[in-house]
Curated annotation (Swiss-Prot):
Protein name (database record): Aldo-keto reductase family 1 member A1
Record PTM Phosphoserine, positions in chain: S4, S38, S211
GO biological process: aldehyde catabolic process; cellular detoxification of aldehyde; lipid metabolic process
Residues involved in NADP(+) binding: 11-22, 45, 162-163, 211, 213, 215-216, 263-266, 269, 272-273
Localization, UniProt: Cytoplasm, Cytosol; Apical cell membrane
Length: 325
């Protein structure tokens, strides 16, 4: 069952539901990927920083390619360039490492994971003596030019951005000869991202939602905060359509043409998450879900400084979340 797709400006078809692999432990992610492929997933979302690309690569090697269960051209694989690899000289080696780990000859989509650069080197989170991050002055426009060279070499089919705001997207568009095809950001009914999605769609970028279920497993969640999966309107729609609350949240996104990459290592949930194409919400039901928006951003990298939790990068000039969207 091929999940419905979004057509990218590159002509590629990107499946609306993919398997997310952030926080999937090595030791579990290989089986999750193999199971997902077996039930019809054709989109896997990866990143170098997740630390599990070698294991995902084992699954891809076993199940993808000539004479195997899934032809390579039917699979859409995304990965992401980490912050320590923004210097133009580091971009291709970083991609080559990801390709070697994933045991692939090319990526369908390569994203710049964050707009700002960390100090070059092999420590993914280089720190100053006071515990703050060591940044590098490389601007994302320089990094973008190096990414474009990967497309010219046939190593990457499309480029995109992650955690960029509207101004930064336009900044990239002003210098790009290879235009970004996708923006990946946190998005769920509590953070509907309506303005940012409209901004992207007007400029030919598709949007991928990470943490589409609201990331209630995050360590820093306030115990008094409402839980998206337990919202009365979500539960009522789940009952009406005979689905799970997660399916309701995913259906809301795909009906807005927003790609989702729910993470799971549980076979029953992996299967459930892709079964969102056999029912449709009425405009009124979409409105009820839209009304949950609180502009609540859950995924903000934090640091503990002097015993207090503070946003890690909020003082950086390229920090994306100080703008309205």
């Amino acid at each position: 069952m091929a999940a419905s797709c979004v057509l990218l400006h590159t002509g590629q078809k990107m499946p609306l539901i993919g398997l997310g692999t952030w926080k999937s432990e090595p030791g579990q992610v290989k089986a999750a990927v193999k199971y997902a492929l077996s039930v019809g997933y054709r989109h896997i979302d990866c990143a170098a920083i997740y630390g599990n690309e070698p294991e995902i690569g084992e699954a891809l090697k076993e199940d993808v390619g000539p004479g195997k269960a899934v032809p390579r051209e039917e699979l859409f694989v995304t990965s992401k360039l980490w912050n320590t690899k923004h210097h133009p000289e580091d971009v291709e080696p970083a991609l080559q490492k990801t390709l070697a780990d994933l045991q692939l000859e090319y990526l369908d989509l390569y994203l710049m994971h964050w707009p700002y650069a960390f100090e070059r080197g092999d420590n993914p989170f280089p720190k100053n003596a006071d515990g703050t991050i060591c940044y590098d002055s490389t601007h994302y426009k320089e990094t973008w030019k190096a990414l474009e060279a990967l497309v010219a070499k046939g190593l990457v089919r499309a480029l995109g951005l992650s955690n960029f705001n509207s101004r930064q997207i336009d900044d990239i568009l002003s210098v790009a000869s290879v235009r970004p095809a996708v923006l990946q950001v946190e998005c769920h009914p509590y953070l509907a991202q309506n303005e940012l999605i409209a901004h992207c769609q007007a400029r030919g970028l598709a949007v991928t939602a990470y943490s589409p279920l609201g990331s209630s497993d995050r360590a820093w969640r306030d115990p008094d905060e409402p839980v998206l999966l337990e919202e009365p309107v979500v539960l009522a729609l789940a009952e009406k359509y005979g689905g799970s609350p997660a399916q309701i949240l995913l259906r809301w996104q795909v009906q807005r043409k927003v790609i989702c990459i729910p993470k799971s290592i549980t076979p029953s949930r992996i299967l459930q998450n892709i079964k969102v194409f056999d029912f449709t919400f009425s405009p009124e039901e979409m409105k009820q879900l839209n009304a949950l928006n609180k502009n609540w951003r859950h995924i903000v990298p934090m640091l503990t400084v002097d015993g207090k939790r503070v946003p890690r990068d909020a003082g950086h000039p390229l920090y994306p979340f100080n703008d309205p969207y």
